[in-house]
């Protein structure tokens, strides 16, 4: 048999391979290229793509566009007003009847260097979450799947991009034609509230027509089971300042007489949420869309993780009296910070001049950000608060006993896609094929991703492909990516490219 005939036969054999065959072939490819794949993630993490570094964001966008070009994609870089570029890619697959858009973001959260065990932009491999540093480049594969690569963006969200690229490379090496036309949208402003995303998507709506959006963001279920999700909670931030005296006052001379803004803030918190974490603001949840039977069944099938997580987090109790996933289906109020007076060595016996509460609300389908703001402000006024937008002057202070300044941050609503649609069934089947068994199916991720924008503009199913480990320290110091999760991500993306159909 000549070489050309042998090559053609190899392609024919590879073409109709079963799901199990593809999974095994992709895993074999990955095993043979582990060092190169980790090297690609290492290289990407070294690019400083955080909001404070516009040059780093631009360089990262250019790097990623080049990665798509070398793989045969038609590419473009979309930006407006100096915003970080959105990297777009298109690869048509002959005969494909569906088009899937693969979304991820390449920007990361800001860093506080003193809190990191190592330079966040010089990736380090460790043998566990609190493990020792490893010289992985000198080690021989296969690498221990429990090893973790530490660095900003390693999990959120650069690992999704590398999984996509590695999966594409695997399919090309295996001569597997994608079952869908592939479009790529990689954003550089997600961690900064996606300020320009809506406008750019509207401008390029024609290029972004598809049958499904696949979102590469978020962690897998805490059981470490391969996971897909069908939505995400919305988000809305609020900074509230409560005012006390014009200057700090000696608490021996004026305590019990001059109102203490820190105590007022503590009282306000207990009026917004009870001891079980449930929101007690009147009418707050009136507009919430209930879960469907299919969504409730999906939650009931999830592996229990609560006992293990209590040990991992060092807590004796949980709030709400329900499973973790069930609790994330409800709206929530989180007190993300309180500032008032002094503590520790700087503590003094004084009544502080103000107290600042930083709050984030998580929304669920049915709620809107304007509607939530109206309900919160109506609640405050009913409790006797005078709501202001600017720092109050003396006249205002003397006229009103309880003054609170509200500074609402950016936000967006929640989304839950239909878990029973044909596209959903196709994604579930491909994900199960990649996993080689059952997967965790979440009606909605507890965290927030601005996927509502995609829904409002394009009206197609939006489904998440999370791959990060649940303990990846996303947004915090010592962010990390567990290798087993990276390997699972490559298998997942390969299945979405080669087997997705409906």
Regions found by a protein language model. Name each.
Residues 97-183, 488:
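Active-site metal-coordination/substrate-binding segment of hydrolases
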Residues 222, 280-354, 367-378, 383, ...:
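An extended, acidic, His-containing surface patch that forms the Zn2+-binding/catalytic region
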Residues 40, 50-103, 118, 122:
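A non-catalytic alpha/beta surface segment that caps or lines the substrate-entry region
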Residues 255-276:
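A short core secondary-structure module
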Residues 14-17:
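N-terminal signal peptide c-region/cleavage motif recognized by signal peptidases
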Residues 19-56, 71, 114-115, 232:
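N-terminal hydrophobic or amphipathic helices/low-complexity stretches enriched
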Residues 145-231, 501:
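Acidic/histidine-rich catalytic neighborhood of metal-dependent amide-processing enzymes
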Residues 1-6:
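Bacterial N-terminal signal peptides that target proteins for export
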């Amino acid at each position: 048999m000549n070489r050309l005939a042998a090559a053609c036969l190899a392609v024919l054999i590879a073409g109709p391979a079963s799901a199990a065959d593809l999974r095994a072939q992709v895993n074999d490819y990955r095993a043979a290229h582990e060092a190169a794949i980790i090297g690609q993630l290492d290289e990407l993490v070294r690019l400083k793509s955080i909001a404070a570094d516009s040059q780093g964001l631009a360089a990262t966008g250019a790097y990623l566009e080049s990665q798509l070009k070398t793989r045969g994609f038609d590419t473009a870089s979309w930006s407006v007003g100096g915003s970080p570029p959105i990297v777009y890619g298109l690869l048509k697959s002959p005969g494909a009847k569906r088009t899937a858009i693969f979304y991820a973001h390449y920007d990361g959260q800001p860093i506080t260097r003193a809190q990191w065990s190592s330079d966040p932009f010089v990736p380090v491999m460790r043998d566990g979450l609190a493990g020792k540093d490893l010289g992985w480049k000198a080690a021989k594969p296969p690498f221990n799947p429990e090893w973790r690569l530490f660095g900003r963006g390693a999990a959120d969200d650069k690992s999704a991009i590398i999984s996509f690229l590695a999966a594409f490379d695997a399919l090309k090496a295996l001569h597997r034609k994608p079952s869908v036309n592939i479009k790529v949208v990689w954003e550089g402003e997600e961690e900064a509230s996606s300020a320009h995303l809506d406008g750019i998507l509207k401008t390029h709506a024609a290029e972004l027509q598809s049958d499904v959006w696949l979102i590469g963001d978020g962690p897998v279920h805490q059981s470490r089971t391969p996971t897909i999700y069908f939505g995400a909670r919305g988000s809305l931030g609020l900074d509230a300042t409560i005012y006390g005296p014009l200057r700090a006052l000696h608490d021996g001379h004026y305590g019990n007489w001059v109102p203490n803004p820190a105590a007022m803030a503590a009282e306000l918190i207990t009026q917004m949420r009870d001891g079980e974490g449930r929101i007690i603001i009147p009418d707050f949840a009136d507009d919430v869309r209930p879960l469907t039977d299919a969504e409730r069944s999906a939650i009931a099938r999830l592996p229990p993780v609560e006992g293990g997580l209590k040990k991992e987090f060092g807590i004796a109790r949980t709030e709400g009296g329900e499973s973790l996933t069930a609790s994330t289906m409800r709206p929530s109020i989180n007190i993300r910070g309180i500032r008032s007076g002094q503590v520790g060595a700087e503590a003094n016996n004084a009544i502080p001049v103000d107290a600042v509460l930083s709050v984030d609300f998580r929304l669920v389908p049915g709620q809107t950000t304007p509607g939530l703001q109206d309900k919160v402000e109506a609640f405050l006024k009913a409790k006797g608060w005078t709501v202001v937008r600017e720092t109050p002057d003396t006249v205002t202070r003397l006229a009103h006993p309880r003054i609170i300044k509200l500074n609402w941050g950016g936000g967006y609503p929640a989304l839950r896609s239909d878990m029973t649609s044909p596209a959903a069934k196709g994604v579930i089947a491909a994900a199960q094929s990649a996993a080689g068994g059952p997967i965790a199916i979440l009606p909605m991720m507890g965290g927030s991703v601005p996927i509502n924008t995609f829904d409002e503009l394009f009206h197609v199913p939006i489904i998440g492909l999370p791959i990060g480990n649940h303990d990846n320290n996303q947004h915090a110091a010592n962010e990390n990516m567990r290798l087993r999760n990276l390997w699972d991500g490559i298998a997942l993306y390969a299945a979405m490219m080669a087997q997705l159909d409906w």
